[in-house]
Swiss-Prot record:
It holds the Pfam family CN_hydrolase. It catalyses: a nitrile + 2 H2O = a carboxylate + NH4(+); 4-chlorophenylacetonitrile + 2 H2O = 4-chlorophenylacetate + NH4(+). It is an enzyme of class 3 (hydrolase). This is Arylacetonitrilase. Nitrilase that hydrolyzes preferentially phenylacetonitrile, (R,S)-mandelonitrile, and 3-indolylacetonitrile. The keyword Hydrolase applies. The lineage of its organism: Eukaryota, Fungi, Dikarya, Ascomycota, Pezizomycotina.
């Protein structure tokens, strides 16, 4: 089966740790590199700007590094974000960005953005529940963050494609995934931090947190959703290990973490690992996505269509944005 093909780029790179300006510069360079490789969409990993806070798995409280982290996080309405949007427009490429969002109260959130080839911010959301030790740094998302799929217009034979994204272990939340499927995504970006292979069957480390376990979750999302999945991971080399002092901790102990890949709608891996599987290697994984295969797989499994039983099982959703201050309504005056 053959249909219109969309070339995509999946980054596998080390962030500029805790350096907002350096992070934006590297992001712009990777956007340009992906466009030169004829990609129409480029994906970045979880917390790409300014890097995933690996120290939380070594020591949960570090006010010095945490302060620097907040100061180097990215605001949605900022000159830095405008620079990234301009790079998307100049290179005529869609950008799916993982970043740490800072707000004016100095709280930070694990966030994602989808930017069109025209430089428009089509979607911005926050991870609805940070995972385990991440809660020492990040706040929760809210109802509006359940909208995680956007229409991206690539023009030509491709036209409009529904592109969605989730962060890390959001791929282990069945109800959130089902709501994502209901938005009819055709391409899904699964964002992950640097992840290492599991040390062995007798090790106490969770297999579900390993490179193998995380890829399994991405492949499951592809099968259940009938969508292409761009499995995007970051890299952490000595610069990150030394800078965050993670040696001897649960994660980020050795250079590596990179396992980016493209996954087909039936769950198969489409691409080979970079540099013969060297997880410390930086680069870009490219893939040509035959969009007709989405249709073919949906014909077999459509979990929000013909392969569902809404008369028996259904999902309730509250998309309202929750605020800390809710003004009390004044009673209406009798006329």
């Amino acid at each position: 089966m053959s249909g219109p093909a969309l070339k995509v780029a999946i980054t596998q790179a080390q962030p500029k740790w805790l350096d907002l300006a350096g992070s934006v510069e590297k992001t712009v360079n990777l956007i340009a590199e992906a466009a030169k490789g004829d990609a129409r969409l480029v994906a970045f990993p979880e917390c790409w700007i300014p890097g995933y806070p690996g120290w939380i798995w070594q020591r949960p409280v570090d006010p010095i590094i945490n302060t620097k982290y907040i100061q180097n996080s990215l605001s949605v309405n900022s000159a830095e974000m405008n620079t990234i949007k301009s790079a998307a427009k100049e290179n005529n490429i869609a950008v799916v960005l993982g970043f740490v969002e800072a707000i004016d109260t100095h709280s930070v959130y694990i966030a994602q953005a989808i930017i069109s080839p025209k430089g428009e911010l089509l979607m911005h959301r926050r991870k609805i529940k940070p995972t385990h030790m991440e809660r020492t740094v990040f706040g929760d998302g809210s109802g509006s963050d359940l909208t995680n799929v956007a229409d991206v217009d690539f023009g030509g034979d491709i036209g409009v494609v529904k592109v969605g994204t989730l962060a890390c272990w959001e791929h282990a939340l069945p109800l959130l995934k089902y709501h994502t499927y209901s938005q009819k995504e055709a391409i899904h970006i699964a964002m992950w931090p640097p992840i290492d292979p599991h040390p062995g069957v007798d090790a106490p480390a969770l297999w579900s947190m390993s490179a193998e376990g995380c890829q399994n979750l991405s492949q499951t999302h592809a099968i259940e959703g009938g969508a292409y999945v761009l499995h995007c991971t970051a890299v952490c080399n000595e610069e990150g290990i030394e800078g965050m002092k993670t040696k001897g901790g649960l994660l980020f102990q050795e250079p590596g973490g990179g396992h980016s890949a493209a996954i087909a709608p039936d769950g198969r891996r489409l691409t080979k690992p970079l540099a013969d599987g060297n997880p410390a290697a930086e680069g870009i994984v490219y893939a040509d996505l035959d969009m007709a295969r989405v249709v073919m797989n949906k014909g077999f499994i459509d979990v929000v269509g013909h392969y569902s039983r809404p008369d028996l099982l259904w999902l309730g959703v509250d998309k309202a944005q929750k605020g800390c201050v809710v003004p009390k309504r004044e009673p209406e005056q009798d006329v």
